[in-house]
């Protein structure tokens, strides 16, 4: 997704609130609930690191499609430098969370990036699957998660 700030992350949680229950009680706002707010604040801090001018070049890179800054976790490592740069970004996030956050926001980016890089594998039985996964990868890299959410009218059908 285009790099976003912690404030954008928190706003997205509030605008597209999921139904969350703790001990049988509905949580009205995950961003302020005492059992969840510290995790939300930690994730927001990680997103803010993408805009920290001292390390922004280590946290983001320029998208080859949109020219926007996107998270380094989306980079498809084609060189040793690419892999090194991605490790630096992940190290920043691991240190910021003291290594205690097992699923930082980049884990799914890396998964989809790897699938897109293996497009030929997906094309073995159905050639269009290569285009599908590569187009999906570009879509999630270029669009913030709150812009990708399924509308409430559609969610009710699932």
Question: Which sequence ranges carry the predicted segments?
Answer:
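Acidic/polar, glycine-rich intrinsically disordered N-terminal extensions of enzymes
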Residues: 1-63
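Structural motif
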Residues: 19, 146-147
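Internal helix-loop-helix
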Residues: 48-146
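Conserved small/polar residues in nucleotide/adenosyl-binding loops
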Residues: 147-154
